[in-house]
């Protein structure tokens, strides 16, 4: 092969090799381009980001209230939660106003049906398998019957225990814990309450007379005697209430029981495990009688107590000069005060004082516990909402309710009186529900009322009254 041909062939080989290399280079640089959509997932990257949780949802999630958080994020928008309870008229309006903002933020429609025959109607509905999603019980004893029958959802199955302990005094949780078919369970959450351990007095006249607020039972008795020595009767008392005559007397017994025996004994008493004939209950009645049965201490004397309508009992306190100076009753009684009297000027209140220092400063209450009968996510969300002070905030501003929630600010109250009562309850060593409302109806709304009325009227002695009350307790 001559040199020229060899050079030509070599040149062609080099050119061909370079051409192949160039083709290979094109493939190498194109490969990432053909894989780019998969490697960078461009379509996903260009999608709009998920909507951020609202501040309300974030706050709920931080508290462990996951269903409430989801509700604020709109997850249950368009759903309906049915409720029933005793709220009618003005109370129904206040309740609906208190949940209105929640409904607007979540899109959940809370349909509340109030009934003046609530106790009878709810039993019919539950027995017929037509229970609403949530029921508002003013009487925990009635709720306890449904819990025992296995009709109520245990809130411990979904609600944060840490949150409940953070937002309620232990006493509220104790009162919401009831015996179910499989043992103790969290039967509901407390949403609002009324305070009972209160003594009302005509503030301006009281101060003008030089009287001082008693801090103990002994000081209360000394004040009572001081007023008697001044020629007046200290106490305004009346227990007439139609078919319910006698109930104000049961409140006195309950308040004194809380101050003279243990919470365990009080709870046993409400369950029928501590008899009315026991020394503990008899002692409470005898302490009450020190005031009630002394004609120098009670306006109109003992004989007037049974015939005086409970709502009229405090009226003489506002005469000039007052015909009586002290009236023990719950915060609802202000609605019976004469028109035009001014809180903080014409009247005020003080805490019904402790008796035995061993039992501290307990507080007697009545109120509403919300229980869940149907288990769906949106119902769980509403129940978690009821465990927050926000659920009753609008009601506090409007007046007529107190909040059991630790996260409810005292600044939310539109009434100085109710704010002061709420503060007392926050400071209380323990809280217990009205005992007669925890007892079976035959006792709490029957023999207890009648026994106290007959004893106060002088128709029977104390031992007979206590024995007759015990005899009415249902035998299982």
Write out the residue ranges for each language-model feature.
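Hinge/lid segment of periplasmic solute-binding proteins
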Residues: 51-77, 141-197, 221, 227, ...
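Short, well-ordered beta-strand elements
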Residues: 77-88, 108-113, 134, 187, ...
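Extracytoplasmic/periplasmic substrate-recognition and gating elements
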Residues: 100, 104-105, 128, 184, ...
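Glycine-centered hinge/linker elements that transmit conformational signals in sensory
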Residues: 224-226, 270-306
């Amino acid at each position: 092969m001559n040199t020229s041909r060899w050079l030509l062939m070599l040149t062609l080989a080099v050119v061909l090799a370079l051409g192949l290399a160039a083709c290979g280079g094109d493939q190498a640089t194109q490969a990432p381009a053909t894989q780019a959509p998969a490697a960078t997932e461009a379509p996903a990257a260009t999608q709009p980001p998920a909507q951020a949780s609202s501040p309300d949802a974030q706050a709920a999630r931080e508290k462990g209230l996951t269903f409430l958080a989801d509700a604020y994020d709109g997850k249950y928008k368009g759903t309906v939660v049915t409720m029933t309870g005793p709220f009618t008229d003005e109370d129904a309006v206040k309740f609906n106003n208190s949940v209105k903002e929640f409904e607007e933020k979540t899109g959940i429609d809370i349909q509340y049906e109030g009934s003046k025959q609530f106790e009878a109607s709810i039993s019919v509905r539950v027995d017929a398998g037509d229970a609403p999603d949530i029921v508002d019980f003013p009487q925990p004893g009635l709720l306890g019957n449904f819990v025992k029958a296995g009709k109520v959802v245990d809130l411990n199955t979904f609600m944060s225990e840490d949150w409940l302990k953070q937002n309620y005094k232990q006493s509220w949780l104790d009162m919401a814990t009831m015996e179910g078919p499989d043992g103790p369970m969290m039967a509901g959450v407390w949403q609002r309450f009324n305070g009972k351990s209160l003594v009302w007095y005509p503030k301006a006249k009281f101060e003008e007379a030089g009287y001082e607020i008693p801090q103990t039972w002994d000081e209360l008795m000394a004040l009572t005697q001081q007023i008697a020595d001044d020629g007046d009767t200290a106490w305004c008392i009346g227990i007439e209430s139609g078919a319910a005559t006698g109930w104000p007397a049961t409140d006195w017994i309950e308040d004194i029981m809380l101050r003279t025996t243990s919470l365990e004994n009080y709870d046993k008493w409400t369950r029928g495990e501590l008899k009315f004939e026991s020394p503990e209950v008899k002692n409470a009645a005898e302490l009450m009688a020190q005031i009630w049965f002394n004609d120098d201490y009670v306006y109109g004397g003992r004989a007037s107590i049974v015939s005086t309508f409970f709502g009229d009992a405090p009226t003489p306190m506002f005469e000039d000069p007052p015909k009586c100076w002290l009236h023990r009753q719950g915060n609802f009684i202000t609605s019976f005060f004469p028109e035009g009297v001014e809180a903080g000027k014409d009247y005020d209140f003080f805490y019904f004082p402790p008796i035995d220092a061993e039992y501290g400063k307990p507080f007697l209450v009545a109120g509403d516990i919300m229980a869940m009968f149907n288990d769906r996510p949106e119902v769980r969300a509403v129940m978690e909402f009821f465990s927050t002070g926000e659920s009753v905030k609008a009601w506090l501003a409007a007046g007529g309710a107190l909040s059991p929630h630790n996260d409810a600010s005292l600044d939310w109250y539109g009434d100085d009186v109710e704010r002061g009562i709420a503060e007392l309850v926050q400071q209380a060593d323990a809280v217990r529900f009205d005992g007669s409302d925890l007892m079976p109806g035959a006792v709490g709304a029957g023999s207890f009322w009648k026994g106290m009325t007959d004893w106060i009227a002088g128709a029977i002695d104390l031992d007979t009254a206590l024995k007759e009350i015990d005899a009415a307790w249902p035998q299982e």
